[in-house]
Amino acid sequence: MAGLRGNAVAGLLWMLLLWSGGGGCQAQRAGCKSVHYDLVFLLDTSSSVGKEDFEKVRQWVANLVDTFEVGPDRTRVGVVRYSDRPTTAFELGLFGSQEEVKAAARRLAYHGGNTNTGDALRYITARSFSPHAGGRPRDRAYKQVAILLTDGRSQDLVLDAAAAAHRAGIRIFAVGVGEALKEELEEIASEPKSAHVFHVSDFNAIDKIRGKLRRRLCENVLCPSVRVEGDRFKHTNGGTKEITGFDLMDLFSVKEILGKRENGAQSSYVRMGSFPVVQSTEDVFPQGLPDEYAFVTTFRFRKTSRKEDWYIWQVIDQYSIPQVSIRLDGENKAVEYNAVGAMKDAVRVVFRGSRVNDLFDRDWHKMALSIQAQNVSLHIDCALVQTLPIEERENIDIQGKTVIGKRLYDSVPIDFDLQRIVIYCDSRHAELETCCDIPSGPCQVTVVTEPPPPPPPQRPPTPGSEQIGFLKTINCSCPAGEKGEMGVAGPMGLPGPKGDIGAIGPVGAPGPKGEKGDVGIGPFGQGEKGEKGSLGLPGPPGRDGSKGMRGEPGELGEPGLPGEVGMRGPQGPPGLPGPPGRVGAPGLQGERGEKGTRGEKGERGLDGFPGKPGDTGQQGRPGPSGVAGPQGEKGDVGPAGPPGVPGSVVQQEGLKGEQGAPGPRGHQGAPGPPGARGPIGPEGRDGPPGLQGLRGKKGDMGPPGIPGLLGLQGPPGPPGVPGPPGPGGSPGLPGEIGFPGKPGPPGPTGPPGKDGPNGPPGPPGTKGEPGERGEDGLPGKPGLRGEIGEQGLAGRPGEKGEAGLPGAPGFPGVRGEKGDQGEKGELGLPGLKGDRGEKGEAGPAGPPGLPGTTSLFTPHPRMPGEQGPKGEKGDPGLPGEPGLQGRPGELGPQGPTGPPGAKGQEGAHGAPGAAGNPGAPGHVGAPGPSGPPGSVGAPGLRGTPGKDGERGEKGAAGEEGSPGPVGPRGDPGAPGLPGPPGKGKDGEPGLRGSPGLPGPLGTKAACGKVRGSENCALGGQCVKGDRGAPGIPGSPGSRGDPGIGVAGPPGPSGPPGDKGSPGSRGLPGFPGPQGPAGRDGAPGNPGERGPPGKPGLSSLLSPGDINLLAKDVCNDCPPGPPGLPGLPGFKGDKGVPGKPGREGTEGKKGEAGPPGLPGPPGIAGPQGSQGERGADGEVGQKGDQGHPGVPGFMGPPGNPGPPGADGIAGAAGPPGIQGSPGKEGPPGPQGPSGLPGIPGEEGKEGRDGKPGPPGEPGKAGEPGLPGPEGARGPPGFKGHTGDSGAPGPRGESGAMGLPGQEGLPGKDGDTGPTGPQGPQGPRGPPGKNGSPGSPGEPGPSGTPGQKGSKGENGSPGLPGFLGPRGPPGEPGEKGVPGKEGVPGKPGEPGFKGERGDPGIKGDKGPPGGKGQPGDPGIPGHKGHTGLMGPQGLPGENGPVGPPGPPGQPGFPGLRGESPSMETLRRLIQEELGKQLETRLAYLLAQMPPAYMKSSQGRPGPPGPPGKDGLPGRAGPMGEPGRPGQGGLEGPSGPIGPKGERGAKGDPGAPGVGLRGEMGPPGIPGQPGEPGYAKDGLPGIPGPQGETGPAGHPGLPGPPGPPGQCDPSQCAYFASLAARPGNVKGP
């Protein structure tokens, strides 16, 4: 045991060393998911696109953005629109999330105009990728990419502009729609043209190329260009072709290092195998591999490599973990593709079959694999062999090596001939490859009907070419032929001198593009390239054009610098009311403004909320002085405005002034009914331009203007500041299947840690299930040559590991002769971790785990424990399923204000435009500067009183009222539920019955059922425990002999005897028959997640150990917290490996818990069927000391006797006559197992005899064997409190008891179901203020309350909705006279108003009375179940009944059913989970190794994979063995032979040993003196006694005092109440 513990500690230290060094290096994964871009969309918004199609463009941009990870440090997106000139819609750095960019894309505005693509290309080259516009420095982390979308030919030149963009490092993808010229698109796009040009027929089709464009974008950024011969691919002309990919022959310099060989029939090739071909992955794939690619190679096996297992190509990381590989298994004739998985460690596909077998001959073959997102296809010799599905792959880690041609198990270079090996970044190229480079390949020689380009005239005979099948070119010499017909158009000439502007002719059909002509030579030769000219002077302004069509509303520009304060403009029409704003604090007093001109009469303003006629208010604060105008005629009565902000006034009463100038614009209110329209005033002069307003709603389309003459092209204007995003567009067309989504969170397997020091060897683990064959590990460093070791034990065949990196090349040695087979070397160090095995079959159920810590006893129902400490952050979850398409987000907040644009030149004054429809109200403008103070206006006329307003809306809830008077007492409540049974007063013990006859020998009992074995495991006094939990079923015994004994004759019934003195406590009875398994209880509420458990000990417990532990533990088991996890269930799906947990500190030894209270006994279960006999166990070692024999009555403890020799099992004798118990003798030797007896047949039930006279109390006899369950007897007297027993099996629900006395409140139980609504209870006292509730539904209108007292003046209210015209109000009090105002212009004559009657101020009303009670509230949730009530008063003692007649001994019952595995699992969890940890830790600490023999446990389920171990120290080099062929994985071998028997250890302290079989009954001892013990279970009824005389009934005792119930004891009293009446004692 000590050795095991030492090994466990060493193993833990070793794991800690490995784990603590695990944070050193992060994997650097590279691929499509890790490349980010500065991406600019260049969108044609010319007139040929049209508004409807531009809507599809907006949606296309949004859909394409959805395939990128957008963020400040990820991909940034900008948009530039162009037609006549380019403008920036939004810059690269403006939006930081995908949703913001998509929303902005859907708001892009359409311009219309010409198509100047060249100008747009120059614009993005100079501006869009600059740091000022959000661009980032160009490096390999951020790629500058532009995607151009156009639908027509450019009206300026594009070639030079595109070349400048390419030189600046901008990769351009050109997408043409409809009539866009492919030749022009190719001039614009980057190389290779075929990968950067897309063309679709119309705008409906642009979304179909979205996925293809996204893949090309990744491929072309990750992959360099490779030049290949044209005859490599089908459907192409001869010559060279540029495509994206990796030519591994060039990248590894294979031909330069190994030298090339020529074969006349084919291309040159290289003979591999003499030197390892290895390169750093960062040098080969600096950006990783694309998501889809094609691997193509032309090679042939050599004699030595045909049957090898090797990698033709492999990428490994810095820890030699494979990232991607292609394996050729010569022995099994298979091709295997492996890669790192996104959801699992590795994914792979294996190709086998007759067509794959052909690859392994010694001919030349072309092998191509097309690796796509969800499948892999294998092509051999240009024919598709098979397509297999594959799971999602992860990007490769580029911090490692890439190898060509190495053996799997030792990384030795492989001998084979290699002609070419290339990776194309387009997976389709695997099927486009031809086989013309294979001598025997299917390359048909057929002449292509397409003629070659015509040769130049007067060409002498030269070698020509003809096209053949698969476009293989064959050179031949041809004489010049006769003159042919006129050839196709010649190449385009040099540009001619610029001609005059001609009239625009009709659009001609596009002609074919001519080939580029030779550069012409001028008279002085070709001149040098001139310097770039300066910007030209601005051209003269063109003539004013005719009025154009009304344009679309422009994008909102950024706010310009504030202009000078303009003159006050004419009063505009009233805007729509804005939404009510919050009440602001009163502003500072403004200075007096200059006198303004008299404004026109405004339209009718908005009324406030209608109110009831109020009392005459106190005098309001003086309003601000208005601009005085001349006396006009009396106008209409205006609506009552809110109180104004206090103005600067002289504190004297003045007359009412004229209507003031309009105040500052209020927040928009809800729309009111239209007011009466005032007369139209004279048109005011144009004011200076105000501040830039916010964008208005789109106006109606104006009438088409007269087309204007084409003006001269002006110089490009300065760049405008970007406007805010426009409103979202309508949903676009459904997109095609999207590009693979963003990478999920990192997988569970972390990166391997740094190399730590070599730790001590770990302890041997339990034998796991054999995994799949792994790949070979790296070869260790060669150690010193060791001596040949002795023959080791035969080990299991190791799994095949993955080959490691090749070592440095050695000099080729002289080939030696074949040596003799060496002796078997010592076992080598373990190899590195192989690939993760696939999911194995379900392993056998492991033993139960070690228990959790015990808690002190808590009564039922179990309360949740205190919240554990916060757990450490869990591993990231698996990526979730893609969510449903979200609804378009709301408009994002306005972006930050950009820098002010350069001030433009003042434009010529345009002709006035046609009057547009009134615009929607603009947002509140910035407040203008304060004007000088205005003069006091003249007093206004008294207004007419307003009409009564409408009834106001329901006011806010008042504050909580004072508590009302206590209501009358309610009706009596419904009868309560029956309470628990009351506790009776302790009665006197009854008379002791006669001893029963001994019963027949029973079958072997389970845990805790054999007398004397309950508490003797640790020595000391044996006290009978209560009934234990059902043990694990033993093997069934054979049928026992029938019992002996004859029932006595029934005696006559005697009268009841006098009350006897209390007898001494009887001996324990045998346990009764096993009750049925209780039904599963309702599942408890899930508890809080606990802290990580302490690590368990390494040894496992067998079922036998569990028996013994349960036997020891079950005697003193308080009900604890929830038990340990149950036995393993069916094997689940393979989980994601978790990170290794930190090692917890070793817990201190816990003290033994206090004795628990007994649970209520269960009801007897149904009889079970006989189980099958179990298999014989292994022969155990001889035990040092057996368990004590059947104990007699309690005597003084004797000294342990010496171990006796093994006795021979004697035949079981008949039961002896009962003797008196003797003193406890020394334990006898353990006998062999007796043969199982044959169960007797069930006898008929005997008839009840007449009661006999009471006999004399006899001495306590030996307890009889368990008899059949008798009829329920009368309740006995209360026994003494016994020791706490183990909880019995869960019983079924008992019947409802009678109502008990009111108990103390219990702890909160779980929420019960909602009960029926009870009668209304009496009114309770007022509660405290509760926390604010959630807003309720609007209630019904209440009855009008009485008039309240007048409140104080409120702050100015918000503008109200337009109300109906009110009645004339009372005249206000005389106002303070204002200052003299400047006379205004004459106003329009107003309508005469009517004078209203003055109102009378009412008195203050009395306070209103208390309102009516509200409706009953919604029924509350049912409260928690209360605590158990206090103990009821004891009932009166009943009279002692006469003893019942003893029945005849029954025959043994049939064997009970074995409990179900579910019941066993639950019982073991409940029993072992309570005290096992502290007891087990204590026992293990006390035991010497000799007591820890345990039976072989079953293997547990496979644990999570550990981290990769460090390479072990170099071992001594063994003698070279003959390399064997890698065999397939064999079945697990049989368990090896048992080791030699160890020496006998010293006797240790009593421990948990394996339990022996039940020995034969010992010789009955002498009767002992009566002892004191707990009451036993009822024995078998004795023979019928004579009938005794009837006794006098006793007087009922006085009632006892009311009991008190400690909450911790409630479960105990509940168990008493639920006990059967015939059970004595606790």
Swiss-Prot record:
Restrictive expression is observed at tissue junctions such as the myotendinous junction in skeletal and heart muscle, the articular cartilage-synovial fluid junction, or the border between the anagen hair follicle and the dermis in the skin. It is deposited in the basement membrane zone of the myotendinous junction and the hair follicle and associated with the extrafibrillar matrix in cartilage. Residues 1405-1414, 1521-1530 have a biased composition (Gly residues). Residues 571-580, 715-728, 742-751, 1440-1449, 1595-1604 have a biased composition (Pro residues). InterPro entries: Collagen (IPR008160), Collagen_superfamily (IPR050149), ConA-like_dom_sf (IPR013320), TSPN-like_N (IPR048287), VWF_A (IPR002035), vWFA_dom_sf (IPR036465). Keywords: Collagen, Cytoplasm, Extracellular matrix, Glycoprotein, Repeat, Secreted, Signal. Residues 506-1002, 1019-1103, 1119-1458, 1491-1609 are annotated as: Disordered. Its main location: secreted. It comes from the Eukaryota. Residues 1-27 form the signal peptide. Residues 38-213 form the VWFA domain. Glycans are attached at residue 375. Acts as a cell adhesion ligand for skin epithelial cells and fibroblasts. This is Collagen alpha-1(XXII) chain. It comes from Homo sapiens.
